[in-house]
Amino acid sequence: MTKTSTTPMMEQYQKIKDQYPDAFLFYRLGDFYEMFNEDAVKGSQLLELTLTTRSHSAKNPIPMCGVPHKAVQSYIDILVDQGYKVAICEQMEDPKLAKGMVKREVIQLVTPGTQTDTGAAGAKRNNYLTALTLADSGEYGLAYTDLSTGELKAAAITGEDAVLNELMSLQTKEVVVDTTVAEGLRQRMKQLGMMISTQDAIQTSSEISYVEQDLTTDLLRQVVGVLVTYVTVTQKRSLAHLQRAVVYQPTAFLKMDHASQTNLELTQNLRTKKKSGTLLWLLDETKTAMGGRLLKQWLDRPLIDRQQIENRQARVAALLDHYFERNSLQEELVKVYDLERLAGRVAFGSVNGRDLIQLQTSLEQVPQIQHTIEELDEPVFDTTLAGLDPVSDVADAIRAAIVPEPPLSVADGGVIRDGFNAQLDEYRDAMRNGKTWLAELEAHEREVTGINNLKIGYNHVFGYYIEVTKVNLSKLPADRYERKQTLTNAERFSTPELKEKERLILEAEEKSVALEYKLFVELREQVKAAITRLQKLAAVIASLDVLQSFAVVSEDYHFVQPKLVSGHQLKITQGRHPVVEKVLGRQSYVPNDVTMDDQTNILLITGPNMSGKSTYMRQLALTVIMAQMGCFVPAEAAEMPIFDQIFTRIGAADDLISGQSTFMVEMQEANRALSHATANSLILFDEIGRGTATYDGMALAQAIIEYVHNRVHAKTLFSTHYHELTALDESLKQLKNVHVGAVERDGDLVFLHQMQPGPADKSYGIHVAKLAGMPTKLLQRAEVILTDLEQSAANQPAAAASQSSSAPAESAQAPVSDSVVAQDVAASAPEPQEKATAISETDQQLSLFSDAPELSPAQAKVLEQISQLNLMGMTPMAIMNQVYQWQQKLTK
């Protein structure tokens, strides 16, 4: 930053700017916020403003640009949405009364995590600011808040990966750290698009000391202290709406890592990156902003407590049984504004008259909502009824004080009702009488002078004036009119009578506006005292809203109440993918069963591409998530256990940021499942091993299946194109083969989308290529090659996986962060002679070329090592690491 001290004002600017070097400084000058120097150059580009200069005659003129103060919020939003900070510097005294330089201070630092003006587009989204600290024990403290609602939660988390997963789940834009957080983790967070801010010293505030009352460990007190201090320092205003910190345990909810949430398209469509086409989109029939935010929170954290799940189910069932009452409830909820964020604006001091009318309107719906819930006559809603506090004293106070349609700004006056305050009424009478007197004076002066177009007006510079066109100036008396302003075609004058009346009117206006603002602040403080009650009411209404949303979608899409079982039996009858069904229409969707009893843990799924294998897998995961949210599910009947975790590997996506290949990402996601899954988990693996050479992939796929079967025992859906693996059902007793049906009709492939028992008999790959529109000659050539390959396979026994010749795996530039512990895997696996013949002892990888090139010494060495490898005695991660080493040797 080029420091400029040509004037006292620029010296003041630079002194303030030095305190906020990483932020745009919006420096108030009159009716504009100005930016100077580098801020102006960059800001003009980002905000599409005209770049000008200050001190044109100077040797080095100062770049500057500005935005009008009345429109400043929109410009702040643009910068913050792009990941910048904005320091708002205000004039702290009236420039007219200032002696010397006007005093200025930064009144707020707006950052991605502290932005509270979310607008309509963000009404149903939380904006979380997160803090992170590290204890000597290696455990992380994590706390987050949404400043617009006052929500504040904290947790202790072990491991960097778990921390990153939690941050991504929260979709946090900004993380506040202290010195305990290592630079490596800071860089990983930055790579994920999070702004890193620092806050080392903790400051205590008596106003909000209550937030730590329920914290029982030093780690949690430390991280909440860091978070609250940062908010206090940057926002510089009341935070009375911050709620007591709630300690939560991530293990108390169904765990899904970020990859699984992404693969399942819970809240963001993989293709469009938008809400449409997601499970959240399907389930969202909420009528309030609060309900919309709570729905997403429930979706992010499904329950694992059976009693809590069944309590939600019971309330959804009750709402389903009462159609008319449910409709009445929806009509009432539509009239409820965002109580949480209204309460936040009250605490911040940014609430206006229209906000208070919205609050009043919302509170007036509560008695109607109470009546509707009472009409249900369902005991499961007793707690809800007890929490429906209408906060009638606040509603009454607003109704008595505020006009029904107040102006946007309190400073403009006209917000307080007539009759509310006697002194205010007197000032207003003086103003009204004065304006009546002005109208009478105008008529009188026209009559006396004979000037019909004479008029009385007002502006902020000259006050009240009498305006006469120049052609009529000769008609004015010479002794009564005092010239005030000359215009092109007219002159403006004053008279002694007009001056006196102007003084009285302006004095009344000034006192009226000041008194009105004082009365408004008193009302705001009265509402502020009820913030806790308003927040509790908001929570009850939000919960009601989500439950009625569940009831609506359950009725509209013919969902059923799932039965939760204590064992491991899973039985979904005629299950459906809810989002695909909504897009296609119910008549076009083919439902399928999923049956896995206590003796079946793995379904090995085969079938052609595009036949619906991935959809089948996703629909089971979505059914589980919906059930554990408390919603009904898309099926004719459903029985299921309560799952503790869901792991998925569906689809292929390179991690370009960290330089990891598709295969490495695939192995890492698979490893997370193998490392952390329990017998109560659900695993979905789609085409594991396809990212590497054929036999490498097949070997890994088989080893992973065996590992899950023999060690993990989780319910698993595993789709594959390796048809040799279907023979595993002979040795793995808890594995069953199923396939997606397809038939050939007149040379064309017809997908049945129906899951059938047993393995698929063909892969139909060339048929799928035909459906994709591949050239006819290419398809004909593929048929010839396929025939040759099949004949070669029939004539040559295939080599065992331990002796197979395979190409090295794709490059992987980063090591796996956590690994499956290999503790005598061979001891837990079946003996080699008892294994399925999925990979026989003499198989060799087929070549599309008749003449194989001569091997280099390095290639020959790798081939020798492959032939000596004992695949059955290795973990999946050990295999992957060995393949990675070979790849490094072959690419040198």
From Swiss-Prot:
Q: Name one GO cellular component term.
A: cytosol
Give me the residues that bind ATP, please.
607-614
Q: What start and end residues bound the annotated signal peptide? A: none
Q: Which NCBIfam families does the UniProt entry name for this protein?
A: mutS1, PRK05399.1
| Compositionally biased residues, Low complexity | 796-830
Protein name as catalogued: DNA mismatch repair protein MutS
Q: Report the superkingdom from the record.
A: Bacteria
- Keywords on this record? ATP-binding, DNA damage, DNA repair, DNA-binding, Nucleotide-binding
